[in-house]
Amino acid sequence: MEKNQKEIEKELEELRKREKELEEKIQKLETIAKNSNLRVAELQREIDYLKERYRRDLEEQRKFCYEKFAYDLLEVMDNFERALEYGRQAQDVKSILLGIEMIYSEMKKIFEKYGIREIPVEGKEFDPYVAEAVEKVETDQYPPNTVVKVIRKGYYIHDKVLRPARVAVAVPPQEEEGEEIT
């Protein structure tokens, strides 16, 4: 019986030792879990901060994305004001027209600088992706569905349609009532 009790005490000692080891492992794992949770919370705060910073930066870019373009247009505005002032005093219409042509040329250069260009449509087949047909012109001088007149120019900004052109499109002439077809 003594042997049994010694064996039991030995087993009990081993179990206590094992229990202590397991408690230490649990303690370590709890510490790791706590540190991991702290790190996750820290990373979440960092992500939230970066999201907010990105949102602010994007808003700032939206607000000022046309700043350079607007600055370049100020020179055109100044020239228009000078032309208007000169026009009020000038007697010579040709010099006023020349000033307006210079301003128009300057404006086209600024548009070109920013990737804004006219959509060439006149004389071409009507394309609803770049133009709106606002008039029909009966004619046999052009094939049907050909743009015969640009009413308002259309523009691209890079490869995207900024504003579609408004155009008149050729349609075949209608036969007059009472005319016989022979």
From Swiss-Prot:
**Ranges in coiled-coil conformation:** none
In terms of Gene3D superfamilies, this protein maps to: 3.90.20.20, Head domain of nucleotide exchange factor GrpE
The reply to whether DNA repair figures as a keyword in the UniProt entry is no
Q: Name one GO biological process term.
A: protein folding
Query: Which species expresses this protein natively?
Result: Aquifex aeolicus (strain VF5)
Q: What does this protein do?
A: Participates actively in the response to hyperosmotic and heat shock by preventing the aggregation of stress-denatured proteins, in association with DnaK and GrpE. It is the nucleotide exchange factor for DnaK and may function as a thermosensor. Unfolded proteins bind initially to DnaJ; upon interaction with the DnaJ-bound protein, DnaK hydrolyzes its bound ATP, resulting in the formation of a stable complex. GrpE releases ADP from DnaK; ATP binding to DnaK triggers the release of the substrate protein, thus completing the reaction cycle.
Quaternary organization: Homodimer.
The primary location reported for this protein is cytoplasm
PANTHER family in the cross-refs? GRPE PROTEIN, GRPE PROTEIN HOMOLOG, MITOCHONDRIAL
This entry carries the following GO cellular component terms, namely: cytoplasm
Q: Where is the protein situated, by its record's location annotation?
A: Cytoplasm
What CDD domains has UniProt attached to this entry? GrpE
Q: Which UniProt keywords apply?
A: Chaperone, Cytoplasm, Stress response
One GO term in the molecular function aspect is:
protein homodimerization activity
Tell whether Cytoplasm is among the UniProt keywords. Answer: yes
Q: What is this protein called?
A: Protein GrpE
Q: Which InterPro entries match?
A: GrpE, GrpE_coiled_coil, GrpE_head
